[in-house]
Amino acid sequence: MAAKEVKFHDHARTRIVQGVNVLADAVKVTLAPRAVMCLIERSFGAPVITKDGVSVAKEIELQDKFENMGAQMVKQVASKTADIAGDGTTTATVLAQAIVQEGMKHVVAGVNPMDLKRGIDKAVATVVDELHKLSKPITTNKEIAQVGSISANSDHPIGKIIADAMDKVGKEGVITVEDGKSLDNELDVVEGMQFDRGYLSPYFINNPEKQTVEFDDPLILLYDKKISSIRDLLPTLENVAKAGKPLLIIAEDLEGEALATLVVNSMRGILKVAAVKAPGFGDRRKAMLEDIAILTGATVISEETGKQLEKASLEDLGRAKRVELQKENTIIIDGAGEQKAIEARVKAIQAQIDESTSDYDREKLQERVAKLSGGVAVIKVGAATEVEMKEKKDRVDDALHATRAAVEEGIVPGGGVALLRARSRIVNLKGDNGDQDAGIRIVLRAIEAPLRAIAANAGDEPSVVINKVLAGSGNFGYNAATGEYADLVETGVVDPTKVTRTALQNAASVASLILTTDASIAELPKEEKAAVPAMPDMGY
């Protein structure tokens, strides 16, 4: 085992905080509509230019082991916020840095870190409760467009195209983002289906950047039983390999030898293949497999209908223009099934809805109708260069997640103002002792940080902006895009409540862990042996 270096108390925390500051300062420059870009070197190809906070955070690895631990902990804040809310990563990072910096002052002064944490938790819970009270439901197409625009760094065309997509496939509909072939953004609505099952093994992933499996023009095998032996699958795999197409297997389960063989073939590039579990359970699973079969023009391989897996032919396999497998979802786009068959299936399910007496069954049947008839909206992002395309796609993804979060929990005034307004609830909040009161004061000060960063990036004096906003009330705040003060909801500067809430909760969680850390352990750097000196010239 390699030797370890151990640091205690302030020596441990100080180095960790230095790492937090390096990452947060790099991410902070991307906050606000007038923020600057961050340029990221790539080991090959052109550098990436981005205003996406989580993209910046993911690139940071520090040489000092203790500083790197601090950076990685704050990176978790950004990643978790992105996973839950889809946006707010920069806000979460800025809040985490502010809580850590304010908290360190108290820890160094001898305040009990555990009571400090309890005070922070109490203040955060109160602020979150107030955010829910400030929240306003989002209903109109215009409001959806406003949320999307703000999240995409005030890019109004992006906000509009997302609002149009939601209008066409519904607020709960499936919307995907792809590279476009022109300079302009385009919106296509294609027949498609999404179900809540993801890839069975991460080794199937062929797009490591998005952590997804993506196949164009695949064949689709549907089987209603468990597959354990590769022998049953071999004839189908050989036929698919000859056809030169990717294969998606949807079955009750895949395990053991069968799954291992598919993974090895996929990793070696012998066959483009991936597998997912069939959606639903019991009779509902069979019905949903039949839905997928009708959508893709496949035949479900089932012993009940006399079909055996080892005798499946290419004619039994379904087809689609594209499939995308995520960790927890699968999307089938533009299946090759006949429109008449799909319409007949929808009518049959609607008849079942009319006859159903169970609210639960009716809800599940309605979900199936939506999956068959709703379609998938595809936003094709246009750009002049590959570098611009990557940056723009990141912003469209952020904006899409933000609008979904807004639909879910509503909106609050943007630009860091909602946190300032919610702060009023904790001004007079008291803890069980003085150390907990110090934790409450940390949050009171830290939730100014996002607005301070926004003002600084826009070239204004943060303290002046904070005081002017606090002098107003309600939705009155600072619009960084114009440099003016106005009703932010009326001018379209809004944030999803879920994004603001999640950013604060995740920031407080990780910052509290850093403040209560009293020892850090890291591997000692390996000593490089000196190279053997070259032989001197012997004069020959």
Curated annotation (Swiss-Prot):
Signal sequence span per UniProt? none
Q: Which SUPFAM superfamilies match?
A: GroEL apical domain-like (SSF52029), GroEL equatorial domain-like (SSF48592), GroEL-intermediate domain like (SSF54849)
Q: Name the enzyme's class.
A: isomerase
Q: What GO molecular functions are on record for this protein?
A: ATP binding; ATP-dependent protein folding chaperone; isomerase activity; unfolded protein binding
Provide a GO CC annotation, any one: cytoplasm
Where is it chiefly localized? cytoplasm
Keywords carried by this UniProt record:
ATP-binding, Chaperone, Cytoplasm, Isomerase, Nucleotide-binding
Binding, ATP? 30-33, 51, 87-91, 415, 479-481, 495
Entry superkingdom: Bacteria
Compartments, as annotated in UniProt: Cytoplasm
**Pfam family membership, one:** Cpn60_TCP1
- What Enzyme Commission number does this protein have? 5.6.1.7
Q: Name one GO biological process term.
A: protein refolding
Reactions listed under catalytic activity: ATP + H2O + a folded polypeptide = ADP + phosphate + an unfolded polypeptide
Q: How does it assemble?
A: Forms a cylinder of 14 subunits composed of two heptameric rings stacked back-to-back. Interacts with the co-chaperonin GroES.
Q: Which family does it belong to?
A: Belongs to the chaperonin (HSP60) family.
Q: What does this protein do?
A: Together with its co-chaperonin GroES, plays an essential role in assisting protein folding. The GroEL-GroES system forms a nano-cage that allows encapsulation of the non-native substrate proteins and provides a physical environment optimized to promote and accelerate protein folding.
Name of the featured protein: Chaperonin GroEL
Tell me the organism.
Methylovorus sp. (strain SS1 / DSM 11726)
